[in-house]
Amino acid sequence: MNFIITTRDFSNDDSVLRAAEMRDNVAGSISKAYKGTVRAEGKKKLLLKHLPVPPGGCSRRNSNLFVFCTERDYRKFHQGIAQLKRAPAELDPHEIQQVTASIRCRLQPSLREPPTPADELQTAVSRVCALFNQLVFTAQLRHYCEHQDKVVSYARDELTKRCGEKSALGVEVHQLVALLPHERHRELCHVLIGLLHQTPHMWARSIRLIGHLRHYLQNSFLHLLMNSGLDIAQVFDGCYHSEAYRMLFQIGHTDSVSAALELSHSAAAGPPEADENNDEGEEDDDELRHSDPAPLHDSKKPRNARRPRTRVPPHEQKPEENEEEEEELFPSCKATAAFLRAEPSVSNDDGNGGERCDTLATALRHRADEEDGPLASQTSVRVAATPSPSVTSALTPVTSPITPLCI
């Protein structure tokens, strides 16, 4: 005989279910408002309606568009986009995918076990910021590399995958919205869900709107982290502490900023010295205070002789190492650009036409010596070195005819 055992929840506490239903209802109502708008421009206006005006007005096009990232992080990936735009290389989409997946943010996810509600909020915000930065990078690829067919097709497909409620960003956004109290953060929930309903065309064309979103999300997320009791020095990387404290000062959290400034000043001052050393230092200060000022510089006196510079021959010179040079994100584009720079070109329209003709003449001379002998070499050199009529007219001196005198 088979027994079927069923379990039921006989508890009368429905607070958890009601809270979950309320969160689903809030997210569902916001999604219905965007789904009811057919045109992409209407969805964009609905998103702008819930975005406050930034204090500095519209953001610049070349400003940092990554959330919780330094200027150096953003410049590194932006130079990679410029590298793709300059070098017409046969690039593998898998290489772009690897670069996109390496984009993160300076907010660390929490690794504490078991996690507290503040740790869950920190991890959710970190994941949303990382996926938002990857979406922004893909949108910039689509915007700036519009003449590269393969890059455009890859960026269009990636934008379609990364937009929508069923994407990876949509899953993380809904998890973050479930952790927020909707009564206090209704505008933030509306903006987060509104991001998921924007079209790929909007992401590729509205670069300034992305800067507007970045400014709002940074301030809102920083408010959430501070109100949850998290410490800035523990949740952010060390290179982002100064930027985080600057934003805290702008949004009004002056207490933590003053404490951080006092800590930085005490660390810069070093450990206090003994009382005897302090007394000796005070005596030295008194002597310097009462001593006569230093005499002014006399212009008639000969100045100190400068150390002579030693010239190094060209073959012994070493190339200067540029420590601040950014790494190349796409090596294949770098190799293609180097090949294009090394390829000889002939042009008499610009100012370097003579030098390029000399280079071509030298190449033809060596080729003629190998094939036909010295006579053909001289002929080829004479033909190659002959400038164009425009150059000849520019180099020929203008002389007036001389009329003979009759005596």
From Swiss-Prot:
Bias kind Basic and acidic residues: ranges: 287-301
Query: What is the purpose of this protein?
Result: Acts as a transcriptional repressor of the US3 gene expression through a specific DNA sequence named the transcriptional repressive element (tre).
Composition bias, Acidic residues: 273-286
Task: Kindly report the protein's main subcellular placement as a broad class.
Answer: host cell
Q: Where is the composition biased (Basic residues)?
A: 302-312
Q: Where are the stretches annotated Disordered?
A: 268-330
According to its UniProt record, where is this protein located?
A: Host nucleus
Q: What name is this protein filed under?
A: Transcriptional regulator UL34
Keywords for the protein's UniProt record, in alphabetical order: Host nucleus
Family membership: Belongs to the HHV-5 UL34 protein family.
**Any keyword Kinase?**
no
* CC annotations in GO: host cell nucleus
